[in-house]
């Protein structure tokens, strides 16, 4: 496999000013910055507004013995834009709190959102869902599920969560993906990864 390296690094950006424009459940900062151009020169000062919400950890719980994945269904206000439904099928995910490790978040959110106990975690990918406007990085895992509260409604009451837990065969989950029924990027990435690597990982987990 050939290497494709990036032209510049963090030393090639200079943030001259940062100002918080809004601070509520989320935060919006305005940055005045300069960065190196591909001809080697520097840009003039540019204003960019950045949505700050911290990092998140996500996990796709997978019961390898039955070859079924755990998906959760919940309401998402960002999808109130004329779509057929603002409820989505998703993987488990949550924000990383100060002092928490990624594994801690994965286990906590699996229990809170799906009543799901995990006995193994495998990192899949770390990525920026919208780096042109948001600083959030998501770290995605696949987890070996021991149990789950399938058919139950879970979530944290104080966070107004109302989450329905589903168990879907791996084959049916991929079929939902191919039919366009999965419409959020995190779950699309997780299921595409499972479609490519699931057979190998299932064999490893069933016969360690």
Functional labels for PLM-detected ranges:
Residues 1-13, 17, 73, 84-87, ...:
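Nudix hydrolase/Nudix homology domain
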Residues 33, 61, 71, 142-143, ...:
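Conserved hydrophobic "DFG−1" position in protein kinase catalytic cores
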Residues 115-116, 182:
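Helix N-cap/coil-helix junction residues
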Residues 117-122, 128-129:
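Acidic/glycine-rich phosphate/pyrophosphate-binding loops and surrounding catalytic core
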Residues 36-38, 63-65, 75, 144-148, ...:
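Short loop segments at secondary-structure junctions
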């Amino acid at each position: 496999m050939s290497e494709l390296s990036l032209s510049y690094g963090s030393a090639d950006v200079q943030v001259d000013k940062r100002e918080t424009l809004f601070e509520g459940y989320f935060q919006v900062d305005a940055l005045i910055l300069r960065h190196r151009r591909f001809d080697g020169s520097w840009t003039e000062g540019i204003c960019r507004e950045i949505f700050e919400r911290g990092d998140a950890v996500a996990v796709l719980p997978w019961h390898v013995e039955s070859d079924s994945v755990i998906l959760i269904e919940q309401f998402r206000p960002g999808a109130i834009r004329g779509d057929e439904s603002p409820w989505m099928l998703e993987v488990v995910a949550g924000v990383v709190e100060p002092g928490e490790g990624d594994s801690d978040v994965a286990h906590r959110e699996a229990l809170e959102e799906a009543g799901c106990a995990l006995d193994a975690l495998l990192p899949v990918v770390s990525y920026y869902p919208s780096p042109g406007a948001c600083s959030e990085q998501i770290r995605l895992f696949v987890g070996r599920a021991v149990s789950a509260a399938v058919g139950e409604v879970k979530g944290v009451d104080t966070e107004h969560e109302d989450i329905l837990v589903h168990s879907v065969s791996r084959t049916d989950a991929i079929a939902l993906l191919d039919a366009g029924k999965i419409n959020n990027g995190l779950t699309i990435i997780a299921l595409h990864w499972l479609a490519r690597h699931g057979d190998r990982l299932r064999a490893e987990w069933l016969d360690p």
